[in-house]
């Protein structure tokens, strides 16, 4: 059996991955998210953007995968599993998932904003947020930026192509922790449904996908995903 998993922020929130508004110090709450997650914001103030992502990099590195991540990884023992994620953390990989396609980039990959060369040097620890931090400089003179898809930027071609292929060949698609409003990723379940593929939504709250999904499970990822593969035949009767 081939299983395609589309995951969003909900699954990582259970591990304590912070959102923009989760800064307990309130240091970042006064900034528009667009200013920290766009090419325009980067060009205006690369030190501020780098400080924001350096802090998030540190925070995400210090949380652990949850039962939802581990359940998806365990499915590999019984099925061919492809993970398509809108998340920029590495929790699927750390849980043991093999094929993970990051549609929005990764907090753990960096590149030169000018020449595109990957940056692999170690980053400084940042247990406390700082408003502005000087980004590293590439040999070409360009600044190093996170390899994240910012507002207005296209999705990376290879992960998107792999996501479409995995969706097109899946026997079942599990959509977990996503709001189903961020396109083009939100269109993948529709692609699966158009092929006659069963789409199982796992989300504590209703989403725009809920009405068309084959099954909607109103539970969190860590509640619903362990044992879900074994329950599929009964659920899909």
From Swiss-Prot:
Cofactor list: Zn(2+)
pH-dependent activity: Optimum pH is 9.0.
Residues that bind NAD(+): 8-28, 86-89, 177-179, 203-205, 221
Name of one Pfam family that matches: SIR2
Enzyme class: transferase
Catalyzed reactions per annotation: N(6)-acetyl-L-lysyl-[protein] + NAD(+) + H2O = 2''-O-acetyl-ADP-D-ribose + nicotinamide + L-lysyl-[protein]; N(6)-succinyl-L-lysyl-[protein] + NAD(+) + H2O = 2''-O-succinyl-ADP-D-ribose + nicotinamide + L-lysyl-[protein]
GO terms of molecular function: histone deacetylase activity, NAD-dependent; NAD+ binding; NAD-dependent protein lysine deacetylase activity; protein-malonyllysine demalonylase activity; protein-succinyllysine desuccinylase activity; zinc ion binding
Residues that, per the record, bind substrate: 53, 56
Deacetylase sirtuin-type domain: residues covered: 1-235
Temperature dependence: Optimum temperature is 25 degrees Celsius.
DNA damage as UniProt keyword: yes
Cofactor descriptive note: Binds 1 zinc ion per subunit.
Superkingdom: Bacteria
Keyword rRNA-binding part of the UniProt annotation: no
Location in or out of the cell: Cytoplasm
Record: active site: 104
EC number: 2.3.1.286
GO annotation, biological process: DNA repair; protein auto-ADP-ribosylation; protein deacetylation
Function of the molecule: NAD-dependent lysine deacetylase and desuccinylase that specifically removes acetyl and succinyl groups on target proteins. Modulates the activities of several proteins which are inactive in their acylated form.
Complex formation: Interacts with both Ku and LigD; may form a trimeric complex during NHEJ.
Family label: Belongs to the sirtuin family. Class III subfamily.
Name of the featured protein: NAD-dependent protein deacylase
Gene name as annotated: cobB
